[in-house]
Amino acid sequence: MLNGYGYNWYRLDNQMRADDLLVRSRASELLESAAARLRDLEGRYRRKYLPPPTREHPHPDPQHLAAAQHYRAVADRILEIDTRLRGAPVPPDDKIWLRQRGEIETLQRLGNCDVVLVARAKELVETAAGLPADVCIDPAIEQEIDKHLGRLAETLTRRDEILAVLR
């Protein structure tokens, strides 16, 4: 890692490690934007259907309150996957085993998984962007969001399996 003048930025493995972090941060940004869209829709829904309490109506309508909380639950599921993505491990930089394992090959496989993560996160963002405002989440759309989240979780699991060989 260190040469006579400092860190060697030009080695392929160092570039691939940096690219891995950049691509995963892009996927994380996409997931955060999908969750932000859902939080925005929740706020709009609350403003429209859950007015401030009055003497005549001190409690909000339970159906509208449940729908607003449903937006929050879906956004939280997206953020769980985002947390898992941000906390995903990277290959250890073990000098002893560096010659024995194919680090470049491993980093390429991780890079491929990360590209798939970005593509699936984009699909999720497109689904969230297509949600209509001021109505509760349709169960079919929620299933589609959960399907996207399941695919993201599968890709993260595949990424963990690639790294499990190195431990």
Language-model region placement:
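Preference for long, well-ordered alpha-helical segments
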Residues: 130-167
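Charged linear interaction tracts used for macromolecular binding and regulation
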Residues: 37-138
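Leu/Val/Ala/Ile-rich N-terminal alpha-helices, chiefly Sec-type signal peptides and the beginnings
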Residues: 1-53
